[in-house]
Amino acid sequence: MSIKLLRYHIIESIKFLASDGNIQLSYYPEFVCKGDEIANLLGDWLLLYQEKTVLENNDIFSQKELMQIISLDNDISMLPPEEFSDYAITHSDKWIDIREKAKKILLSLNEKYSTPDIWSI
């Protein structure tokens, strides 16, 4: 996977995290723990990004941008278990804060919010 394609996946993941909770939940079938899937999404892409940039020495995010993205992922990782229910994803103030932070990150990356590409996340 090219580093540019990886950047695209990360941006789409941030768009997904900026989306309304009902939109987020609609992406997943009923038989999965949707909260867990949402929580792992950005982190999985970040792991691949960090591995790829170390191997290729080719960053496409500035250090400041990368720290903002990692901070967003950390905020999600620090949520208590009760925040991963479908109800919490759509109603919790903590998820509202995560969505707002994701929107701010998109702006800082000169990206506009749009419906995320389902096939890229």
Where are these regions (language model features)?
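Short, flexible helix-adjacent loops and helix caps
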Residues: 22-26, 81-84, 114
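Amphipathic protein-protein interaction modules
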Residues: 48-104
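Structured alpha-helical bundle/scaffold domains in large eukaryotic membrane-trafficking regulators
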Residues: 110-121
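Short terminal alpha-helical segments
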Residues: 1-49
